[in-house]
């Protein structure tokens, strides 16, 4: 399901600059930055900032009476680019390795005064004409580093862009005034809402499959059911662990997360549990549909075998008579009788007709 960059051995070490094995100099960090902005008292400051300059601007604002933080968004950075960001914001090297290599389960980790949250993204792509793949749902990952005055987001996959979330927040200065953890909440809320959207579309697919299976006319495609079940299992692995991690945010870390943000996170937790329960029910329903489809196919095969057997029996009678009278013997009953040939043909036809009527009466034909 996921379509991330291949994993390369990590050379990130505390205090050292990262480099991929077999790789030369890293690309400039600006190549991986989708957006970098400073927010002061709920409003975005004009101008473009490099991460270090943005953090310096925030610290200058904080020495006064204002509240500010920086939000840096990265997309699939390499180890060198990620280490440059880690040097600026003081990110823990273990979290940095996770952010570079992706393929992480949803989790929440605390490093001193910083939280590191991993979320799975989902996008329903079954009816996307440009997709070109057989996937029903594509997944990606978003890693969120949250400190007292910064947010660093790292996206992996085609559907990890947070531009819409940033615009939503910038249109609500009151939310941005709550600080970096408000950004974490809004991102989590956006992603969990997408889970519910995906489950709605999957439910439509399951309803269509259910109608197809129990229809007497439609042909049952077991492969498509297996494919959807495989996708649902992937979704279950992506969503189920998240509820526990969100519960930790809403119930722990009160020294870092404002009480108002923790209230909002409880709402996100409720939606996550709802999505997880839906996906679990879909998994069970698809298991039942697989059994029903298998039974339907087996029953259809039995019907086909009965038809084949009936026609074989009908063909066997004239074949047997023809075989007997086709033997090269001189002394056989009826060889000299003038009406022997038409009589044998009539007997063949009568036997075939009787067999046909018998099989029709027993619903074999």
Regions found by a protein language model. Name each.
Residues 2, 270-365:
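Hydrophobic alpha-helical transmembrane segments and their immediately adjacent juxtamembrane loops
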Residues 250-262, 286-297:
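Long amphipathic alpha-helical coiled-coil segments
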Residues 1-258, 264-267, 271-281, 334, ...:
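Peripheral, non-transmembrane regulatory/ligand-interaction domains of membrane transport proteins
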């Amino acid at each position: 399901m996921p379509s991330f960059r291949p994993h390369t051995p990590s050379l990130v070490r505390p205090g050292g600059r990262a480099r991929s094995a077999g790789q030369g100099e890293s690309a400039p960090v600006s190549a991986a930055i989708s957006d970098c902005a400073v927010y002061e008292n709920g409003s975005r400051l004009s101008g473009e900032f490099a991460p270090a300059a943005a953090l310096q601007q925030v610290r200058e604002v904080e020495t006064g009476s204002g509240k500010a933080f920086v939000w840096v968004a990265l997309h699939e950075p390499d180890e060198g680019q990620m280490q440059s960001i880690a040097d600026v914001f003081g990110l823990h090297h273990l979290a940095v390795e996770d952010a570079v290599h992706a393929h992480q389960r949803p989790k929440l980790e605390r490093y001193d005064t910083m939280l590191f949250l991993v979320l799975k993204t989902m996008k329903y792509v079954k009816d996307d004409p440009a997709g070109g793949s057989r996937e029903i749902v594509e997944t990606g990952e978003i890693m969120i580093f949250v400190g007292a005055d910064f947010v660093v987001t790292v996206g992996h996959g085609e559907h990890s862009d947070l531009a819409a979330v940033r615009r939503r927040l910038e249109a609500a200065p009151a939310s941005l005034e709550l600080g970096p953890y408000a950004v974490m909440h809004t991102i989590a809320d956006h992603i969990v809402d997408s889970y519910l959207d995906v489950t709605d579309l999957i439910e439509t697919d399951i309803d269509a499959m259910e109608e197809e299976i129990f229809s007497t006319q439609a042909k049952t495609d077991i492969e498509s059911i297996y494919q959807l079940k495989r996708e649902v299992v992937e979704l279950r692995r992506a969503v189920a662990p998240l509820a526990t991690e969100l519960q930790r945010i809403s119930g722990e870390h009160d020294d870092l997360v404002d009480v108002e943000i923790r209230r909002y996170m409880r709402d996100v937790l409720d939606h996550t549990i709802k999505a997880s329960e839906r996906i679990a029910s879909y998994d069970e329903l698809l298991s039942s549909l697989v059994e029903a489809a298998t039974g339907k196919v087996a029953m259809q095969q039995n019907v086909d075998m009965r038809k084949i057997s009936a026609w074989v029996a009908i063909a066997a009678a004239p074949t047997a008579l023809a075989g007997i009278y086709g033997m090269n013997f001189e002394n056989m009953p009826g060889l000299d009788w003038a009406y022997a040939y038409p009589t044998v043909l009539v007997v063949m036809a009568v036997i075939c007709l009787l067999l046909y009527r018998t099989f029709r009466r027993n619903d074999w034909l």
